[in-house]
Amino acid sequence: MSFKDLRSFIDHLEANGELKRISYPVDPHLEMTEIADRVLRAKGPALLFENPKNHHMPVLANLFGTPKRVAMALGKDDPLALREVGELLAFLKEPEPPRGFKDAIAKIPMFKQALNMPPKTVRNPPCQQIIKTGDEVDLTQLPIQHCWPGDVAPLVTWGLTITKGPRKSRQNLGIYRQQLLGKNKLIMRWLSHRGGALDFADFKEQFPGERYPVVVALGADPVTILGAVTPVPDSMSEYAFAGLLRGERTEVCKALSCDLEVPATSEIILEGYIDPEELAEEGPYGDHTGYYNETDKFPVFTVTHITQRKDAIYHSTYTGRPPDEPAMLGVALNEVFVPILRKQYPEIVDFYLPPEGCSYRMAVISIRKQYPGHAKRVMMGAWSFLRQFMYTKFIVIVDEDVNCRDWQDVIWAITTRMDPKRDTVMIENTPIDYLDFASPVAGLGSKMGLDATNKWEGETNREWGTPIVMDPKVKQKIDSIWDELGIDDSPTL
């Protein structure tokens, strides 16, 4: 099942008991965050606040608050099915040459599908049913959440920022938080390595002093949103990838103020520009780390046009100490990364980004160890293979007999298979998340790798321990007589 717009997905969630409408008046200032946080921690439904205080536009929250709903957005029933998305990405990133004529014929449909998914331009799009320009532009009329008591101002969180570099043929879609600065101004917090910031830097170099056109889409269809947070190959647009996932081309329309293309079924579109000379102090804001972050200067986005659907819905979220919605999204996308990593490192059995580690700051990887030093090779490869792991501070490597998603198993492996000095890798002066105030310098810090695998000859001079395992025949016998023993609640082994 594919969803052409956000509304059809909302209907689907409601029909399946995955969305709750709240008619009671709730304030976007702090109250929505408290409600959404309680519901998310209870693994509850998406929320549609129908009567936000002092506003006339409903607010959608917790849309991707469980891995199940992320899978549902892509037409899947189980988050594990998201590995199919990872397999597609692994193929697109590094397609294998055909092994023969029959294999070449078999691969033609996939190549053809990938090539036939450019966005489809439509006229009279829903996102331009209402148009506001000039003095009509007033961002304060949107029910933008003020998430935490220490936040400096309301914050746009789920906007798809659309940019294009002067040397690129495709547009870039990225999600960057945006501080409300005034009726027609937002602060665009994009870090220097992100796609939008790179496009902006290229534009400034080629057209110094000129205004840079930018568009932000709020409430796009769920597949396009997820396409924007997935590690799409640099040569492919997020629109094309969303079309592949959907099985239908992504419908777009031309913005009114520039040549950028926007998702045609979006609820709200913000059009405008960035003046390269206009910067503003951004923050502080409560973030996914569970702390308020430092302030810094970022470009100001001036909004010249607001277009929207009739009866538009404002899509929002909050970030805070995990679990939050981005953490749940990270749990689901974890399944996407597994096939991508296995493509490069077939010895990887499983890969896990614990949500309590902010979904990217720690990774645990299980491998089929084949030679001394193998664990160190895999940890170095993981750090360098995908940009998404550039900020991963800790990597733990375990053997295939250890469940890398079970902390009891992982801690057992660390405490019984590691010597702290021999099996710890420390790397200094590496890229670190700017929000990580624990690093000695903003954006630069160290990484730690833990080799918690069994040690081979050459890694140790001692006889290695043999794990204790019960005789399978005895286990089978006890299983067969368990009910007769009169012991309640047999543990699952």
Curated annotation (Swiss-Prot):
Return the EC number. Answer: 4.1.1.98
User: What's its catalytic activity?
Assistant: a 4-hydroxy-3-(all-trans-polyprenyl)benzoate + H(+) = a 2-(all-trans-polyprenyl)phenol + CO2
User: How cofactor binds (record note)?
Assistant: Binds 1 prenylated FMN per subunit.
In terms of InterPro entries, this protein maps to:
UbiD, UbiD-like_C, UbiD-like_N, UbiD_bacteria, UbiD_Rift_dom
Q: Where are the transmembrane segments?
A: none
Q: Does the keyword Membrane apply?
A: yes
UniProt pathway annotation: Cofactor biosynthesis; ubiquinone biosynthesis
Residue positions binding Mn(2+): 172, 238
Kindly list the GO CC terms recorded for this protein.
cytosol; plasma membrane
Task: State what this protein does.
Answer: Catalyzes the decarboxylation of 3-octaprenyl-4-hydroxy benzoate to 2-octaprenylphenol, an intermediate step in ubiquinone biosynthesis.
Q: How does it assemble?
A: Homohexamer.
* Cross-referenced HAMAP family: UbiD (MF_01636)
Q: In its UniProt entry, what is this protein called?
A: 3-octaprenyl-4-hydroxybenzoate carboxy-lyase
What is the protein's species of origin?
Shewanella sp. (strain W3-18-1)
Query: Where is the organism placed in the taxonomic lineage, from the top?
Result: Bacteria, Pseudomonadati, Pseudomonadota, Gammaproteobacteria, Alteromonadales
Instruction: From the UniProt record, report the name of the gene that encodes this protein.
Output: ubiD
